Regions:
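Tandem CBS (Cystathionine beta-synthase) repeat/Bateman regulatory domains
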Residues: 1-151
Protein backbone atom coordinates (compact mmCIF):
# COMPACT_ATOMS: atom_id res chain seq x y z
CA UNK A 1 0.00 0.00 0.00
CA UNK A 2 1.35 3.42 -0.96
CA UNK A 3 1.53 6.00 1.79
CA UNK A 4 -0.22 9.30 1.25
CA UNK A 5 1.84 12.41 1.80
CA UNK A 6 0.23 14.85 4.29
CA UNK A 7 1.84 17.71 2.37
CA UNK A 8 -0.09 16.77 -0.77
CA UNK A 9 -3.18 14.91 0.44
CA UNK A 10 -6.27 17.11 0.09
CA UNK A 11 -8.31 17.41 3.26
CA UNK A 12 -11.48 16.85 1.23
CA UNK A 13 -10.46 13.16 0.87
CA UNK A 14 -11.61 12.44 4.41
CA UNK A 15 -13.44 15.51 5.73
CA UNK A 16 -16.82 14.90 7.32
CA UNK A 17 -19.60 15.92 4.95
CA UNK A 18 -22.50 14.76 7.11
CA UNK A 19 -22.73 17.58 9.65
CA UNK A 20 -25.53 19.57 11.20
CA UNK A 21 -26.37 22.78 9.39
CA UNK A 22 -29.01 25.41 10.10
CA UNK A 23 -29.82 28.78 8.62
CA UNK A 24 -29.29 31.93 10.66
CA UNK A 25 -33.06 32.40 11.08
CA UNK A 26 -33.61 28.92 12.59
CA UNK A 27 -35.37 29.32 15.95
CA UNK A 28 -33.27 28.29 18.95
CA UNK A 29 -36.11 26.06 20.19
CA UNK A 30 -35.87 24.07 16.95
CA UNK A 31 -32.11 23.69 17.44
CA UNK A 32 -32.60 22.29 20.95
CA UNK A 33 -35.26 19.86 19.70
CA UNK A 34 -32.92 18.60 16.96
CA UNK A 35 -30.22 17.85 19.54
CA UNK A 36 -32.42 15.32 21.32
CA UNK A 37 -32.32 13.00 18.33
CA UNK A 38 -28.68 13.13 17.34
CA UNK A 39 -26.61 14.38 20.25
CA UNK A 40 -24.73 17.59 20.93
CA UNK A 41 -22.51 18.06 17.90
CA UNK A 42 -21.42 21.51 16.81
CA UNK A 43 -23.88 23.07 14.35
CA UNK A 44 -22.85 25.05 11.26
CA UNK A 45 -24.82 28.27 10.69
CA UNK A 46 -25.30 29.46 7.09
CA UNK A 47 -26.97 32.38 5.34
CA UNK A 48 -29.74 32.10 2.73
CA UNK A 49 -27.15 31.17 0.07
CA UNK A 50 -25.61 28.48 2.33
CA UNK A 51 -22.44 30.53 2.95
CA UNK A 52 -20.76 29.82 6.27
CA UNK A 53 -21.51 32.45 8.93
CA UNK A 54 -20.57 30.78 12.19
CA UNK A 55 -20.90 27.78 14.42
CA UNK A 56 -22.97 26.90 17.45
CA UNK A 57 -20.65 25.07 19.82
CA UNK A 58 -21.39 23.08 22.93
CA UNK A 59 -20.17 26.06 24.96
CA UNK A 60 -22.60 28.36 23.14
CA UNK A 61 -25.41 25.99 24.12
CA UNK A 62 -24.16 25.83 27.70
CA UNK A 63 -23.98 29.63 27.91
CA UNK A 64 -27.55 29.91 26.68
CA UNK A 65 -28.89 27.31 29.09
CA UNK A 66 -27.05 28.48 32.22
CA UNK A 67 -26.78 32.29 32.13
CA UNK A 68 -27.24 32.67 35.86
CA UNK A 69 -24.34 30.38 36.63
CA UNK A 70 -21.77 32.45 34.77
CA UNK A 71 -19.99 29.40 33.36
CA UNK A 72 -17.72 31.50 31.15
CA UNK A 73 -17.08 34.18 33.74
CA UNK A 74 -16.33 31.71 36.56
CA UNK A 75 -18.52 33.77 38.86
CA UNK A 76 -21.86 33.02 40.39
CA UNK A 77 -23.32 36.04 38.60
CA UNK A 78 -24.17 35.75 34.92
CA UNK A 79 -21.60 36.90 32.39
CA UNK A 80 -22.80 39.37 29.74
CA UNK A 81 -22.22 36.90 26.89
CA UNK A 82 -24.19 34.21 28.76
CA UNK A 83 -27.09 36.56 29.42
CA UNK A 84 -27.13 37.65 25.77
CA UNK A 85 -27.13 34.05 24.58
CA UNK A 86 -29.88 33.10 27.01
CA UNK A 87 -32.11 35.61 25.22
CA UNK A 88 -31.25 34.15 21.81
CA UNK A 89 -34.22 33.65 19.53
CA UNK A 90 -32.44 32.48 16.38
CA UNK A 91 -29.26 30.66 15.42
CA UNK A 92 -27.58 33.96 14.50
CA UNK A 93 -28.00 35.15 18.11
CA UNK A 94 -26.41 32.04 19.58
CA UNK A 95 -23.58 31.29 17.15
CA UNK A 96 -19.89 32.02 17.50
CA UNK A 97 -18.97 34.10 14.47
CA UNK A 98 -15.24 33.56 14.45
CA UNK A 99 -14.25 30.02 13.63
CA UNK A 100 -11.29 28.56 11.80
CA UNK A 101 -11.94 27.78 8.15
CA UNK A 102 -9.77 26.25 5.45
CA UNK A 103 -10.41 26.14 1.71
CA UNK A 104 -11.54 22.85 0.18
CA UNK A 105 -8.20 22.80 -1.66
CA UNK A 106 -6.21 22.70 1.62
CA UNK A 107 -3.91 19.78 2.31
CA UNK A 108 -3.68 17.78 5.52
CA UNK A 109 -0.52 19.69 6.43
CA UNK A 110 -2.16 23.09 5.79
CA UNK A 111 -5.16 22.07 7.88
CA UNK A 112 -2.91 20.99 10.75
CA UNK A 113 -1.10 24.33 10.53
CA UNK A 114 -4.41 26.21 10.73
CA UNK A 115 -5.43 24.17 13.78
CA UNK A 116 -2.11 24.77 15.49
CA UNK A 117 -1.96 28.48 14.65
CA UNK A 118 -5.48 29.08 15.94
CA UNK A 119 -5.21 26.54 18.76
CA UNK A 120 -8.47 24.94 17.74
CA UNK A 121 -9.09 21.19 17.29
CA UNK A 122 -11.52 21.45 14.40
CA UNK A 123 -11.97 23.49 11.24
CA UNK A 124 -14.76 24.16 8.78
CA UNK A 125 -13.94 23.44 5.13
CA UNK A 126 -15.39 26.01 2.71
CA UNK A 127 -15.52 26.11 -1.07
CA UNK A 128 -14.61 29.11 -3.24
CA UNK A 129 -18.06 30.63 -2.62
CA UNK A 130 -17.73 30.39 1.17
CA UNK A 131 -20.16 27.49 1.43
CA UNK A 132 -19.41 25.02 4.23
CA UNK A 133 -18.70 21.70 2.51
CA UNK A 134 -17.01 19.82 5.32
CA UNK A 135 -15.79 19.60 8.87
CA UNK A 136 -12.43 18.23 10.01
CA UNK A 137 -11.67 17.38 13.61
CA UNK A 138 -8.24 16.66 15.03
CA UNK A 139 -9.17 13.01 15.52
CA UNK A 140 -9.94 12.73 11.76
CA UNK A 141 -6.38 13.82 10.99
CA UNK A 142 -4.90 11.54 13.65
CA UNK A 143 -6.84 8.59 12.18
CA UNK A 144 -5.51 9.46 8.70
CA UNK A 145 -1.91 9.71 9.96
CA UNK A 146 -2.20 6.39 11.81
CA UNK A 147 -3.65 4.67 8.70
CA UNK A 148 -0.81 6.05 6.61
CA UNK A 149 1.86 4.99 9.10
CA UNK A 150 2.92 8.57 9.81
CA UNK A 151 2.42 8.16 13.56
Amino acid sequence: MDKSDPENTPIREFMQTDFSRVHQETPVAEIYRSLTGRGCDDIIVCDEDDRFLGIITRMDLLSAITPGMGIRSRRKMGCLECIHKSAALHARDLMTRSHVTVPASATVAETLQAMEKNRHPDVIVVDDDGIAVGLVEMCDIIAFLVREGEI
